[in-house]
Design a protein with these regions (language model features):
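Low-complexity, Pro/Thr/Ser/Gly/Ala-rich linker/spacer regions in secreted
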Residues: 12-19, 572-587
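Short, composition-biased motifs enriched in small/polar/acidic residues
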Residues: 577-648
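N-terminal extracellular ligand-recognition/capping segment immediately after the signal peptide
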Residues: 30-79, 85-88, 95-97, 276-282, ...
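Gly/Ser/Thr/Ala-enriched C-terminal appendages of enzymes
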Residues: 176, 192-238, 351, 466, ...
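Long amphipathic alpha-helical scaffold regions
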Residues: 305-338, 342, 460-501
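Right-handed parallel beta-helix
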Residues: 67-79, 84-206, 342, 347-440, ...
């Protein structure tokens, strides 16, 4: 009784409406002096602007109201949050910008910044959000134009990015952005961009243009399934709550277009508020076991044991990029195989001794169905090396079924503090291993690991937008090969998988230390009838002489051997070519394939009588486009006939 009471009192001041979020959460009110607010913003930014591998983290809260003539500049590990029930409850008049941290407009290292749940009206007519991986822009109302990259400079590059549940009153201009995922947004127009842009459930997206010429757009009409990220807000009595939005299916546009986002409000008194330097796995697990949810305040948490999330519907909310570091060969966090857990806003940083995984979701593969209340992961980053020497086997392992990921960056560092990066210094095998079924990820960024970046063993997996760089630093081809195959595919769907769908995949090569080759950047089963891969691109950015990206998928796609070159593939096939055995066809029965279709594609069966025929012939008309199982038949099939299924 005393222990539980101490936990509750430690996490929430019962005599105050404002919880104790710690020294690194700054809470602003519109009644405060704007000059005082600006001074505090400037102090934080000046510290964080060049603090890529520092230990300081900040969350900046704005209570409902109007804030005039503020210039909010974003630096590393800074999160800006509005505390209204709607983004329009907090309005910033002035600017909220993230400019390129490197010289000459180079934003390719603009990591770990976030802005959520407020409106901004910029005095210069646009909001600049020049960012790369590990960033988020959610529940925002930009009352001007939105730029996703610096528009001036000799190297105006950026490697983003993620925009969700937001309204842009003007247009979105990516400028020099390499790739982006836009989901459940509205805007007047979208123009420009480069290699791989995916639009998912936007209310007025640009037309499909894949494979370009640039920009290359993949457009999917409806968002299949999402529960928007939980968010903090205060009511009219300044009491703090966390809103847990309702689950949406086949959605288009923002969750707040018709008013406050529907959902369930949870008082912050039902959360344990952890503090860096005070709390550890023991105190946090005691709170979770007592039935409390968890808020992690900004800072670094060293964990000799795993944080164990065992209760259904637990909310774990990270503020200001809290960073979990396992120190005893343990995962930083293990989520039990229970319904409805929601984890957001955390960096999982590998310790100096290898963990099996930094985040483990579900402890073993099983048949437990979470489809009515899925486990959800939002805005999560993993990092191996960079700040200090780190190592892990995998970054994230998903064993549970029906998990939804929304904006994940799994990074083996390619640069960092001196002595923290190298093939044998910060090793990790894979960024993501999926063993569960019906796992869906929107926005998967996965880079530089030493074997498969992504290894997918479960069935009915779905990925919408994939960005991956192969490892920069493989010392030799023999060090980066397996079974006499050069390199490892970035995106590997295991041979036993019978159903998988992926849309908008970009894999990039930066081979700047040795002349190595990667035979396939994407590998999928070639005998399955329900494996879909749509809109793929390889880009060889930098290459030592003799390096190459040999193929895109399964031995097909142009070979790239010099920088900067690209190769694309835009057909969706359930398998590139498959043949029926004579025994199956010999009876003269109809050949039939049953496949799951989706509302944004139509499908057609094509055939060749010999694999060497120069072209494919159509069989019948288009089917599908209705989110149901469809059967496609060939009533005249012959024993030598080869088939493929193409999507439009």
């Amino acid at each position: 009784m005393v222990a539980v009471l101490n936990l509750v009192c430690g996490s929430f001041n019962l005599h105050s409406q404002t919880p104790n979020f710690g020294a690194n959460v700054l809470i602003f009110d519109s009644s405060m002096s704007m000059a005082s607010i600006q001074s505090q913003l400037n102090t934080v930014f000046s510290q964080q602007q060049n603090n890529q591998f520092g230990t300081q983290r900040y969350a900046l809260f704005f209570k409902p109201g109007q804030y005039s003539n503020l210039a909010i500049n974003m630096g590393y590990y800074m999160q800006v949050l509005g505390l209204g029930q709607s983004p329009d409850n907090v309005k910033i008049n002035g600017s909220l910008d993230c400019h390129a941290f490197l010289p000459n407009g180079n934003a390719t290292c603009n990591f770990w910044v976030s802005s959520e749940n407020l409106a901004v009206s910029s005095t210069n007519g646009y909001t600049m959000w020049a960012v790369s991986q590990g960033t988020s822009f959610r529940r925002m109302h930009v009352q001007n134009n939105l730029y996703l990259c610096e528009w001036s400079g000799s190297q105006n590059w950026a490697s983003g990015g993620f925009l969700a549940d937001s309204k842009i009153d003007g247009s979105v201009n990516p400028i020099g952005q390499q790739q982006w995922l836009s989901r459940n947004n509205s805007y007047v127009g979208w123009s420009g961009g480069n290699w791989n842009f995916v639009f998912l459930g936007d209310s007025s997206p640009p037309p499909q243009t894949w494979p370009g010429p640039y920009p290359s757009y993949t457009v999917i009409t409806n968002m299949p399934l999402i529960r928007e990220k939980p968010f903090l807000y205060i009511d009219s009595n300044t009491n703090f709550f966390v809103m847990v939005p309702n689950l949406r299916t086949n959605s288009v546009g923002t969750s707040w277009a018709g008013g406050p986002t529907p959902g369930v409000s949870v008082p912050v008194s039902q959360f344990y508020i952890a503090q860096p330097g005070v709390d550890n796995a023991g105190t946090i697990n005691a709170a979770l076991n007592s039935g409390l949810n968890l808020i992690l305040t900004p800072g670094i948490y060293h964990l000799t044991n795993s944080i164990l999330v065992t209760n259904p519907d637990t909310i774990v909310l990270g503020l200001g990029f809290p960073t979990l570091i396992p120190t005893n060969r343990n995962p930083a966090m293990v989520i039990s195989d229970v319904d409805g857990v929601k984890v957001s806003g955390i960096i999982f940083d590998a310790g100096t001794t290898a963990s099996p995984s930094l985040l483990e979701v579900g402890t073993a593969t099983n048949a437990v169905d979470h489809s009515a209340d899925p486990i959800c992961l939002y805005d999560l980053c993993s990092r191996v090396g960079g700040q200090f020497i780190g190592t892990t086997t995998n970054c994230v392992t998903i064993n549970a079924n029906n998990v939804v990921g929304d904006n994940l960056w799994l990074w083996r560092a390619d640069h960092g503090n001196s002595g923290t990066v190298g093939w044998t210094i910060n090793p990790s095998q894979s960024g993501l291993v999926v063993n569960g079924n019906n796992v869906t990820i929107y926005g998967l960024f996965n880079e530089h690991h030493e074997q498969y970046q992504t290894l997918w063993n479960g069935n009915w997996g779905r990925v919408y937008f994939y960005q991956s760089e192969l490892p920069y630093d493989a010392p030799t081809q023999s060090a980066w090969s397996h079974n006499s195959v050069n390199g490892y595919a970035s995106y590997k769907v295991a041979s036993g998988v019978t159903s998988h769908q992926a849309y908008g995949l970009g894999v990039y090569g930066v081979f700047n230390t040795s002349n190595v080759k990667c035979f396939n950047t994407i590998e999928t089963p070639t005998s399955s009838q329900q494996v879909n891969v749509h809109d793929m691109i390889n880009v060889l950015i930098t290459a030592q002489t003799g390096s190459e990206m040999t193929h895109i998928i399964n031995g097909t796609g142009a070979t790239l051997g010099s920088a900067v070159t690209t190769a694309t593939a835009n057909n969706l096939w359930l398998n590139p070519t498959f043949a029926l055995s004579a025994g199956l066809d010999g009876s003269g029965t109809n050949f039939a394939i049953t496949l799951p279709t989706e509302s944004w594609h139509s499908y057609r069966l094509q055939y060749k009588n010999a694999v060497t025929d120069p072209s494919w012939s159509n069989l019948g008309g288009l089917v599908g486009g209705n989110d149901t199982l469809e059967t496609i038949t060939d009533p005249t099939s012959a024993s030598s006939r080869f088939y493929r299924i193409v999507a439009y």
